[in-house]
Amino acid sequence: MAEGSGEVVAVSATGAANGLNNGAGGTSATTCNPLSRKLHKILETRLDNDKEMLEALKALSTFFVENSLRTRRNLRGDIERKSLAINEEFVSIFKEVKEELESISEDVQAMSNCCQDMTSRLQAAKEQTQDLIVKTTKLQSESQKLEIRAQVADAFLSKFQLTSDEMSLLRGTREGPITEDFFKALGRVKQIHNDVKVLLRTNQQTAGLEIMEQMALLQETAYERLYRWAQSECRTLTQESCDVSPVLTQAMEALQDRPVLYKYTLDEFGTARRSTVVRGFIDALTRGGPGGTPRPIEMHSHDPLRYVGDMLAWLHQATASEKEHLEALLKHVTTQGVEENIQEVVGHITEGVCRPLKVRIEQVIVAEPGAVLLYKISNLLKFYHHTISGIVGNSATALLTTIEEMHLLSKKIFFNSLSLHASKLMDKVELPPPDLGPSSALNQTLMLLREVLASHDSSVVPLDARQADFVQVLSCVLDPLLQMCTVSASNLGTADMATFMVNSLYMMKTTLALFEFTDRRLEMLQFQIEAHLDTLINEQASYVLTRVGLSYIYNTVQQHKPEQGSLANMPNLDSVTLKAAMVQFDRYLSAPDNLLIPQLNFLLSATVKEQIVKQSTELVCRAYGEVYAAVMNPINEYKDPENILHRSPQQVQTLLS
């Protein structure tokens, strides 16, 4: 049947194709034939847009090995056989799947039975262990509470108890070292001791008191150990270059909480350093520095100023160094009175050198090296007293007292030396030299005074102290000098005495003018010079008036009274006498320098000489003016007075100026 159908299709297709080829004559027949329409529709189909058709044709092409009538007729059978084979293969595969699913179903059923069995058993076990679960839950709850309590206990112990390592650090051995960990443990003890006070305000007072007592005992043990160690460390600080370790500094910081132990440790430090400073001072005096540099101070004992200065300089440096050591030791101490502690210990350290220092300076002073050296030594002692007291305050009383005593001793012997020198001046007063200049004793004394004042000016003693010393030195030297000069000139004439005193006072004044704090003395000397200058001025004016013949005339004019009558009628005041005097006066006016008293040539100061000449000339002009006024006065009955005194006072003053 399949084959018959294939033939019909093939014939119909062929006929249809032939009909199409016949042209328009067969158009109407083709339109009425269904097969033709289908063929026509198939032929008009565009296969490139129908993907399903293309796929079907591709699948269909596999059935054709060759395009023959036989294969076309058997096409349907081939397709059906192919379809049957596929279905049989599908059935075979699904049979295997079915068998697997049945096996799985059996396994699932077995598992279900097992689970059911386990559920039953669990239910039975649950019913049997209900009490155990309740007990377990209760125990877990209690375990959590106990764990919390354990944590609280651990926190409490951590807060209020030390570890075994910390306990070992604090108790330690007597000779064991102190490290940074020790101070951490000690700080921990102090912190616990402070924190435990919180417990005293709760219902844990008993525990709080026990812990506080335990910490207090630990603190005392730790402080005692720290004190012993610090004492031992201080005893080792016997080298000149003292190196204070950071641990010892921390120890002093910790010991400040125990004032007694703190004080004992400072005393131990001071004792160790005192012996070191004394030994260092003796070595500096007798052995010198390392390798002989610097040389021993005793090598300069022949030079008193350097000898004393080197000793004081060494002590000044040692005092400053010891203060620095103490400041390094106590730099972390915060209690009040640290500065006082430093000064007190420095005083104790330096006290040991007082005796050897005092003995040596006394030897120098008592040997009386001379007033100038004594004064320099006195100023040196005063300077170092001021300098050292500025470093350590007034607490280093022993050393400062020793220096002050030596200062007073040197000052006393210095003024004794000046007084002795002054007394020698008065014991043997020299006569003034022929040139009326300063005596050799005066020159020597002024040279001594100049050296003393020069050393005083170059000293670094405070200003107030220097001024007070100046006043005393000047009084001790100048007053005897003035007295000596006065006694020495007492047997001279008026002009000679005035000249000698002016020269002597002038030398004193020029000496003092070079130094400070002498203003008051300079004023006193100037007043005395001016007093003697007045004498010389009067002597010079009298000398001129006498030499020109105006002295008698001037004195008579001054003493004349109206009731005595006219001057022209008085003896030696007639016109002839006056004209003769004017002749001498004219000679004086032409060469005034020829009429100078000899003493003016002995004056040391040209300025003083000019002053005397100038002021004496003014006196002469004044005297001439009075005589001129009297002669010109008609009451005195001089005839033709212009011919007697032909020069007016203004002309005379102009000529002499």
Swiss-Prot record:
Origin superkingdom: Eukaryota
GO BP field: glycosylation; Golgi organization; intra-Golgi vesicle-mediated transport; protein transport; retrograde transport, vesicle recycling within Golgi
Record key words, sorted: Congenital disorder of glycosylation, Disease variant, Golgi apparatus, Intellectual disability, Membrane, Protein transport, Transport
Location in or out of the cell: Golgi apparatus membrane
Cysteines joined through disulfide linkages: none
Disease with which this protein is associated in UniProt: Congenital disorder of glycosylation 2L: A multisystem disorder caused by a defect in glycoprotein biosynthesis and characterized by under-glycosylated serum glycoproteins. Congenital disorders of glycosylation result in a wide variety of clinical features, such as defects in the nervous system development, psychomotor retardation, dysmorphic features, hypotonia, coagulation disorders, and immunodeficiency. The broad spectrum of features reflects the critical role of N-glycoproteins during embryonic development, differentiation, and maintenance of cell functions. Shaheen syndrome: An autosomal recessive syndrome characterized by severe intellectual disability, hypohidrosis, dental enamel hypoplasia, and hyperkeratosis of the palms and soles. Some may develop mild microcephaly.
Family: Belongs to the COG6 family.
Role played: Required for normal Golgi function.
Protein name as it appears in the record: Conserved oligomeric Golgi complex subunit 6
Native species: Homo sapiens (Human)
